[in-house]
């Protein structure tokens, strides 16, 4: 089995959950859901939220084992920024993590109770 960097895994997963949060925030602004993000995840439709979480974990695992998650490692990002550069691959990985979270939440978690 390939070694997985826990910091890279956690950062990619956090960025994915940020995408899911962004989707909830968009639905809240449109009036499609009410309440907090916690209510949206746990109270309204917990089975959908569990499915979304499972998909985010699976996508993060795939990103970590393929090496994509290593591109969002905060230590790497800080080192590159201190050198005055940031690789396009890191931008792509950050965007991918965000889109994975937003997309899976959009597909699976259709909305909460109003």
Model-derived regions, located:
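Cationic, hydrophobic amphipathic alpha-helical membrane-interacting segments
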Residues: 1-114
């Amino acid at each position: 089995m390939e070694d997985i960097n826990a910091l890279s895994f956690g950062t990619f997963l956090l960025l994915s959950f940020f995408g899911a949060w962004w989707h909830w925030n968009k639905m809240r602004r449109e009036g499609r859901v009410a309440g907090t993000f916690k209510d949206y995840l746990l109270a309204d439709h917990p089975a959908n939220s569990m499915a979304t979480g499972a998909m985010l974990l699976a996508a993060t695992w795939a990103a970590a084992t393929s090496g994509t998650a290593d591109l969002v490692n905060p230590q790497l990002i800080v080192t590159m920024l201190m050198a005055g550069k940031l690789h396009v691959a890191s931008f792509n990985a950050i965007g991918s993590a965000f889109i994975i979270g937003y997309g899976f939440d959009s597909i699976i978690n259709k909305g909460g109770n109003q």
